[in-house]
Each structure stands twice: as structure tokens, then as C-alpha cells.
Amino acid sequence: MTRAILPDVSPDSIDPQFLEEKYDQERLKRINAAGYAKYSEVGDGELERFKVTHRLEDVASSREPVSVDTDVVIIGAGYAGILTAVRLVQNGILNFRIVEKGNGFGGTWYWNQYPGAQCDVESYIYMPLLEETGYVPTERYARGPEILKHINLIAKKWELAPKTHFQSEVSAADWTADRWTVKTRQGDEFRSRYLVTAIGPFHRPKLPGVPGINSFKGNTFHSSGWDYEASGGSATEKLTKFSDKTIGIIGTGATAVQMLPFVANSAKEVLVFQRTPAPVNVRNNGPTPPDFAKFLEPGWQLRRMDNFNKIYTGEPIDTSIVSEEWLSATLQVLFGTESDKPSDPAELEQLLARTDFQVMERIRRRVDETIKDPVTREQLKPWYATICKRPCFHDEYLECFNRPNVRLVDTDGKGVDRITEDSVVVDGKEHHVDALVFCTGFEYLSGVDRHGGFTVTGKDGVTLTERWTPGPSTYHGLYVHGFPNFFCLQTAQAGTNPNFMYTATTGSTQIGHVIAECLKDGVREVQPTKQAEDDWVKMILEGGRGMMHLMRNCTPGYMNNDGNLDEKTARRMFYPGGPTAWRKLLEAWREKGDFEGLQRTY
């Protein structure tokens, strides 16, 4: 297969003044000081219809509540949760339980079964434990059903099903009398010495706060609750019930980019409602070579993950193991070696801007070369910096807009006006649709308790929400002062990049080690010291403020908390050294063996 590449762009063809003015113009169109207030929560009040229930069997209401005493409770049975469980088993800990809201393993991949769903980083670095399971992904970018199959393969290999309680939705977790008590809405109660929240970053869907959203009479759902009863077909089969219908898709982020080609192949007509165009790079997906695993040496997956990390952050590498389109010259400048960077901050910022103008111009040139209609062509061009949005990669998305049955409805940055019983209104004009799909994403930077929809109460009756009122406070991005024996696998203040599986792999290894050592040594309580947590947060804030300065001219989106670049957002940023440095820091911490920064009580 011939590899696609982005068009070349000469630096001499770039007009920095024009681009600065254009970026600012597009940003100002989209500014909304309300931030999350412009979104509505799935399942709130009149939006109960958007709550996903069709993947839950009616067994939770009929079964008897369970009461369990155990050493460890893990909340969440997605990749993060089962990775934590595997680490416990590898450390000889077998007395644990997993508590999961859904009716199966999978987490994000259990709920997000929309057509076209795929991982958007390489399967070989996204799907964990490939060496341990001997599994080889069939494609460079695996599709949802295959990923779900792999998750269940892990659960089977480590015999996790007997230790997992499905359809058990946590309502509260309280620290009392040296134990955590976890209660569910089904009346269950789990008492444990240690608690791990592993609910992942894409758990709480959001809908646009559009007037009339509940008045629509046709089938409508959020992408994370795709209803195949309404559409027909499956994640891999044609959507037969859409064949005579006009389908509206609101949103043009990573989910819509994956979904549109599949829906366009099934529906009579598709209307795509766009606030901000996505930056769509080439993907070059294809089958895994037959001899892929033949020459791999032990430790290959971690090396490949680290190679991606370095490519993404622009660190020097000997060779690119990951043939990866995530490579960005802008990020190389931002994270490269000190000898490569101007020492003056103003000069560095200018260099970043010049470099990024060229990177994004290549994305826009791809639109020029792909889209036939001149108006649609201009509307699909992203006018912002690389750092502003999660990059998208697809080989068919842009081509869809050349199809006669696909029409872009650009809102010029304003979003839709309102929704009626059979239409979406943009700039006063009604656009009739038979079904409406919201690809409007998730709350990404909210806290663990809000993500999960349950309260976490630590010592002295203080909730995590109260403790994190100024923003997250952690040590290593994993533990919280005042919350003994509590661990959270999350993105805030941890080593994170677009491959969340690296964060989950690294964090679960650390959590498994700490719990195992504490159980072995008879530790009653373990938590970070206030000083260790304060020092970690100070470091995060310093890096976070720098990142927010670079994002100040971005259009609103989840990467910049919808334009709310305040101190609270800075505390939600990531370990500034990058994910590989975070892993090495934790490895050195374990090797040292003195539990630096953690206070252990016997």
C-alpha cells in the first residue's frame, strides 16, 4: 500500500501576520466565558432520554445486594481497571474486587460502540499486555469490536470475571475506621483496605446546551450510547434502518471523524453540523504484516510506547519504531533538547509560532487538494495551532464531503441555534433531519468524583470535591493527602499524552507495587505527606501555566477547558517532563525503596 503524506509547504509561502490575525478572528468567534455551562449533562432531568440503558440487562434490580470484605476495591472494568487488577495478581494479591457500572468488561469500549470506532494511536502501543497475551492486532488501528475482544481476553487470562461485580453503579466511597466502604445504587456494600478509582478520562458524556434539545421527536443519542435498534446494522455492518433517512451529526471532533464515513455509506443523506473544523492528518491504516511478531524481542511493546512518546514530544531518537503521523515539528521545538531551543522565552515563542504555522498549513493544503466544492473547502480548514486540539487521522473523512449525500452545515463558530421536533436550526434556517447523533465529547478535565458520578469522602469527612475546589492536588498524580489508602488512575498531574494506555500501564504498575509492599509490611494507612503533595502541585502549576500561555490564542475545546485558562485548569495539567520521564521517575522511586513522600502508619 502506498503511504499518503501531507503536502509540502515552503516556509516562504507562510504569511505570519495574516495567520495571527486569522487565528485570533476565529478564536473570538467561539469564545464563551460560561465554559462547561454551555453544555448539558447526559441523564440530567429532561435529558434522561440520552442516558444509556440499552446495554444494561434488567438484572440489577432483581438480584440481592452483596456485602463483601476484601483487601482492594477497583472501581471500573475498562483497560485502566483491569490493568490494575493484573498488577495486583502479578504482585501476589488475589483478594480484590472490581466494581463496574456496565454489564461487561471494556469501559470506554463497552459504551462507545458507535460505527467506525477505532483507536487513533497505533494498536501495537494502545492495546496493552500484547506480549503477555501473545495477541497481535489485525490492523494498525484496531476497530472497536477487536479492542473489546482483547479486553475480554485479558480478563479471561487473569481470571478476573469471578472477582468482578457488573451492573453495580457506585454512589459513594467513604473512609471510616481504617477501611473504605464503597456503596452502590443497587444496595451493594464493599469494605476494603485500599481503593483504586480507574474510570478513565472519557466517562462523562456532555451535550451542547442548545434550546429545544429535548423536543426532537426522532431517534437521537450521544455517540457513546449508539442505539443499533434505531439504526439497524452493527459496528461492522451497514446501518439498514438509516437507508431512507437524513441523519444529522452535531460535532466534528475525533468521534465524528471516525463515524462519518460509516454513516455516509448507509444513510440517504448526512448533514454534519460544525462549530470548529478538525485538523485531519493522514492515517495510513492497513493490516498488520504477517511477520510483524516474528522478530520482536522481549520488552518490545514498552520500547515502542517510549518511541511514540519521544516522537510526540520531540525528544531525540535513534530511529522511529512507530511509523507515526503524530510527529509534529511544533512539539519537537516545545519539548526538544535544551541545546535546540532559544534561551529567550520570546524567541522560543516566535520559533514555535513559525514552525506551527507551517505544520497547520500542510493540514489546510490537504483540504485544498481533497475537497472539490470551494465553499466547503474553506469551511473545513482549521485555523488554530496544533496544540489547541487533539489531532485527528483519517483516510476517508475529508473525501466524504465530495459525496452527493453528505452536506456540511458550518455554523461559523457559533454552534447551532436551536433544535425543533424535526430540525436543527442554524443561523435562522431549519435543516430537516430524521435522526440526530451528538458527537459532542466528554468532560475531560473534571475531577475523579465528578467523572464517576459518586462522592469520595476521606479523613475528617472531607470530600474529594471539597479538597479539590482549587483544582486537583496529588502526589505523582496518583495519591491524595487526607485520603489514606486511596489511588486514582487519571490524567491530571500524571505523565500523560494522547496514548492514555501508557498512563494506565505506568500508573497501575506503581499502584500495584505500593499496595503489595504495604500489605506485606502490615501498613495500616498510607498517604502522601502534605509537603510532598505541595511540591508536586507547585511543579505541575509551573508547567501548566507555561502550557496555558501557549494555549491562550486557541479556539475553545477540551484541551484548554473550553477556553477557561484559570489556575484551576493549570492544576489539571500533566507532568511537565512527559510520560517517559514520569515512568522513569516512578521506577527510580521504587528502586530507592524508602517510600519518599508517602507517610506510612502501622
Swiss-Prot record:
NADP(+) binds at residues 118-120, 252-258, 275-276. Gene3D superfamilies: FAD/NAD(P)-binding domain. The keyword NADP applies. Keywords: FAD, Flavoprotein, Monooxygenase, NADP, Oxidoreductase. FAD binds at residues 108-111, 120-121, 126. The record marks 390 as: Transition state stabilizer. Binds 1 FAD per subunit. Pfam families: Pyr_redox_3. Pathway: Secondary metabolite biosynthesis. Hypothemycin is an antifungal agent that exhibits excellent activity against Peronophythora litchii, which could be helpful for the storage of harvest litchi fruit. Hypothemycin is a strong inhibitor of a subset of MAP kinases such as human ERK2. It can therefore be used as an anti-cancer drug thanks to its inhibitory activity of Ras-mediated cellular signals. It can also inhibit Trypanosoma brucei kinase TbCLK1 which is a good candidate as a therapeutic target for African trypanosomiasis. Finally, hypothemycin also has inhibitor activity of T cell activation. GO terms for molecular function: monooxygenase activity. Coiled coil: none annotated. Its EC number is 1.14.13.-. Its cofactor is FAD. FAD-binding monooxygenase; part of the gene cluster that mediates the biosynthesis of hypothemycin, a resorcylic acid lactone (RAL) that irreversibly inhibits a subset of protein kinases with a conserved cysteine in the ATP binding site such as human ERK2. The first step is performed by both PKSs hmp3 and hmp8 and leads to the production of 7',8'-dehydrozearalenol (DHZ). The highly reducing PKS hpm8 synthesizes the reduced hexaketide (7S,11S,2E,8E)-7,11-dihydroxy-dodeca-2,8-dienoate, which is transferred downstream to the non-reducing PKS hpm3. Belongs to the FAD-binding monooxygenase family. This is FAD-binding monooxygenase hmp7. It comes from Hypomyces subiculosus (Nectria subiculosa). The gene is hpm7.
